[in-house]
UniProtKB/Swiss-Prot annotation:
<feature type="short sequence motif" description="Nuclear localization signal">
    <location>
        <begin position="109"/>
        <end position="116"/>
    </location>
</feature>
<keyword id="KW-0238">DNA-binding</keyword>
<dbReference type="GO" id="GO:0008270">
    <property type="term" value="F:zinc ion binding"/>
</dbReference>
<feature type="region of interest" description="Disordered">
    <location>
        <begin position="104"/>
        <end position="124"/>
    </location>
</feature>
<dbReference type="InterPro" id="IPR013088">
    <property type="entry name" value="Znf_NHR/GATA"/>
</dbReference>
<dbReference type="Pfam" id="PF00320">
    <property type="entry name" value="GATA"/>
</dbReference>
<dbReference type="InterPro" id="IPR000679">
    <property type="entry name" value="Znf_GATA"/>
</dbReference>
<dbReference type="GO" id="GO:0000976">
    <property type="term" value="F:transcription cis-regulatory region binding"/>
</dbReference>
<keyword id="KW-0863">Zinc-finger</keyword>
<feature type="zinc finger region" description="GATA-type">
    <location>
        <begin position="154"/>
        <end position="208"/>
    </location>
</feature>
<dbReference type="GO" id="GO:0045893">
    <property type="term" value="P:positive regulation of DNA-templated transcription"/>
</dbReference>
<keyword id="KW-0804">Transcription</keyword>
<dbReference type="InterPro" id="IPR016679">
    <property type="entry name" value="TF_GATA_pln"/>
</dbReference>
<protein>
    <recommendedName>
        <fullName>GATA transcription factor 4</fullName>
    </recommendedName>
</protein>
<dbReference type="GO" id="GO:0003700">
    <property type="term" value="F:DNA-binding transcription factor activity"/>
</dbReference>
<dbReference type="GO" id="GO:0009416">
    <property type="term" value="P:response to light stimulus"/>
</dbReference>
<keyword id="KW-0539">Nucleus</keyword>
Amino acid sequence: MDVYGMSSPDLLRIDDLLDFSNDEIFSSSSTVTSSAASSAASSENPFSFPSSTYTSPTLLTDFTHDLCVPSDDAAHLEWLSRFVDDSFSDFPANPLTMTVRPEISFTGKPRSRRSRAPAPSVAGTWAPMSESELCHSVAKPKPKKVYNAESVTADGARRCTHCASEKTPQWRTGPLGPKTLCNACGVRYKSGRLVPEYRPASSPTFVLTQHSNSHRKVMELRRQKEQQESCVRIPPFQPQ
């Protein structure tokens, strides 16, 4: 039978293409399973080597029988343990018993010792003084202030040299010296207004027509006095 111009023997058989035999499938699956198992075993034990190329290292007898470590790693661990022991040996076992080092003291230049002259004894240097020296060494008394004789009466009472008052709360300085004026006269003298026409009302020399204790009244009295003096000095006009 011709199909598309070709004879039947030349065509491929469908049975050859559709081969459902299980031999290759099961063989390939077993191969994959064995390779997966070998890879898993190698991942669990990364230090496993083929028996033909691997020789078991010599084990150290210092460690326990359960722990098997290669000689190179054991030497490294032994060096590390010794280093740690040496490091901890530098510290004291009991930190409370540590002694604090004293602070460094900077010593300066040593002082040079010089011989000092012995202090003179009082008994050896004291000499008795003569009577004349003793008289001069005695402190002279402070001289008392001598006031003006006019301010002191014969019986020793003090009085004002301007108004002759003997009673005043305070004595003040005047033209004749300290404590020569009464309080009223001393205040006016200090301000420059002490004139002969001024008298306190309590003064024993107070005259009403000649003296006053008011500054305005005193100025009027002085003006009147000046006018009187000018009239006396100018002679009256005498026609010839």
